[in-house]
């Protein structure tokens, strides 16, 4: 490649990156440079289950137990094959996000809080699903990071498909 052409490409690329970065920084609501970690909630006292500002927050086992006992909707983000091992009582599951979104909206609407979980701390499916559902208009999503592993190893109630 010709050195003059290479310098021109490098210059144009550099100017483009600089303009994009400047615009993003100066713009209201620009894209964050680093991902913000989810807010962690350690008590049901800190949770409002009816909000209208989009929010995805992380909860621990104790909070998940309290919410489940109070009838909060749980969504299992694991693939259907994993449900044979059991799931949190009352949890719903559907690998089709459109159908799942419709089911959640029918059951609780868009502003009431619900919990999403997957297999364990390392499973990203619950977060991915939470952000997907947020795009559908759900405002108050709680992610139980410990997931199925923490729940089942704690000896809590388990439900099985019949």
Q: Where are the language model's segments positioned?
A:
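Catalytic cysteine-centered active loop of the rhodanese-like fold, especially the PTP/DSP P-loop
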Residues: 100, 105-151
């Amino acid at each position: 490649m010709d050195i003059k052409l290479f310098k021109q490409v490098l210059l144009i690329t550099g100017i483009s990156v600089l303009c994009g970065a400047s615009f993003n920084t100066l713009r209201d609501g620009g894209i964050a440079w680093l991902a913000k970690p989810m807010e962690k909630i350690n008590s049901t006292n800190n949770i409002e289950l009816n909000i209208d500002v989009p929010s995805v927050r992380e909860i621990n086992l104790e909070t998940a137990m309290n919410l489940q006992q109070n009838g909060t909707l749980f969504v299992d983000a694991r693939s259907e094959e994993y449900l044979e091992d059991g799931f949190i009582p009352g949890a719903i599951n559907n690998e089709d996000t459109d159908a799942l979104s419709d089911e959640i909206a029918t059951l609780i609407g868009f502003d009431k809080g619900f919990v999403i979980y997957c297999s364990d701390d390392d499973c990203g499916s619950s977060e991915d699903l939470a952000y997907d559902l947020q795009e559908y208009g759900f405002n108050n999503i709680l992610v139980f990071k410990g997931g199925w592993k923490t729940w089942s190893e704690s000896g809590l109630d388990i439900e099985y498909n019949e």
